[in-house]
Swiss-Prot record:
PROSITE patterns named among the record's database cross-references: G_TR_1 (PS00301), G_TR_2 (PS51722)
Name of the gene: prfC
Domain named tr-type G: residues: 10-278
Role this protein plays: Increases the formation of ribosomal termination complexes and stimulates activities of RF-1 and RF-2. It binds guanine nucleotides and has strong preference for UGA stop codons. It may interact directly with the ribosome. The stimulation of RF-1 and RF-2 is significantly reduced by GTP and GDP, but not by GMP.
Lineage: Bacteria, Bacillati, Bacillota, Bacilli, Lactobacillales
Name by which UniProt lists this protein: Peptide chain release factor 3
Amino acid sequence: MTINQKEAVDSRRTFAIISHPDAGKTTITEQLLLFGGAIRQAGTVKGKKTGNFAKSDWMEIEKQRGISVTSSVMQFDYQDKRINILDTPGHEDFSEDTYRTLMAVDSAVMVIDSAKGIEAQTKKLFQVVKKRGIPIFTFINKLDRDGREPLELLEELEELLDIESYPMNWPIGMGKGLEGLYDIYNERVELYRPENNGGERFIPLKDGDIPSDLPLHNNSVYQQVLEDVELLVEAGDEFSEEKIARGDQTPVFFGSALTNFGVQTFLETFLQFAPAPHAHKTEEGGEVSPYEKEFSGFVFKIQANMNPAHRDRIAFVRICSGVFERGMDVTLGRTGKKVKLSNVTQFMADARENVTEAVAGDIIGVYDTGNYQIGDTLYEGKMNVQYEELPSFTPELFMKVTAKNVMKQKSFHKGIYQLVQEGAIQLYKTYLTEEYIIGAVGQLQFEVFQYRMSNEYNAEVVMTPMGSKIARWINPEDLDERMSSSRNILARDRFDQPLFLFENQFAERWFADKYPDVELKSLM
């Protein structure tokens, strides 16, 4: 081992970026990568004509449609920290992938559009992060455009999300009138157009004000900001590191990711307060320290065809303890089998490099020949640990699926099983006829499934909508095939567990009344 484990762990910052679609999440990710020297030019996220696709949107359909449908993992160094960013899908149809990703991070950055405020998907994702009790940092984006009043945005954030907020900076104007940021925490003003100040971006504050001979000092917008800040300091919440660490207070930063304004200040301040890797909970209720000597981690994502030319499959592992060393032997907890971790990579979206050592907080990619499932625990030696189960979600949309070309059955089956293991869709088979049914939480999931089956597996599919909207599992010992009727569909999931698909709540209630001793269960 060539690294100091404690120093290495303490330098890690592993976080996810969450937002509603189009709030600017992918753009801010790219600006952070730019500061870390990981890329030379930020791609215009939806610049389909220029071909400058977002670095974190690597799948072909993401480039075509300008949306993130998979979670990307990116690592870079900045100052004395090693940063692991997990860029998650903002589209609500991909909430399953996002929720699982949020189990692999130590903090989260919430990006909000200054014109729109808190949106539906932001609220959903925030609740998942809040439940985990990890720190949440807020970046209110798009100051280069006209948006809502900053005080109004803070009030909405506190009311809708039930969390204290502390503004780290405050906008001096917005849109065409944007002059800069009053940096409360660092006691300086950050100028939007430094050329108006001899090229100097920052003006230090003295007694909360800038020198009176500067043109900005007499600006009415700046004078209004001084009043706003005074009000915030007197009437607002006090800055509390303890509350931030518990996820009870969110530091709020304003800026513009597109024009790269306020992003570097955000990054540097974020790194001061974002936590290093923490202890992870086990299924038995215990915890494993990141400084534990023996290696352990869990699979939170499986991705097929990251390199379509090689038709490969990668299991993404969050390291929780110990030091990963190339070629080490570990135990796969679910099966008890020994596995050699020899061909392991780290990522920049779809680009990767071999890794020889990694520690708690790092995300590594293990080549998967079909051994792994989402939620698997890997451990070294005699640890015999099992980490908490990752969330699964009950689909609300269902389709019957068949191969368009019967000669492509082999490709059809391979594609379906790989995409199911990724967690891209859920698969069921009708109990007697073994017809394939796929389930999703949103319509876009079906579109991506159809696209990937055709483009990655050369297996076009025919999808037939079903009336079913509710899936409920039952205990195998309660199953009687006579329970199947015109009001439901009896099926098995991929673990061979029986379930019923119902068209609506009325059909579900009818079943529950007829079989009162049978417990109907949902996933989450």
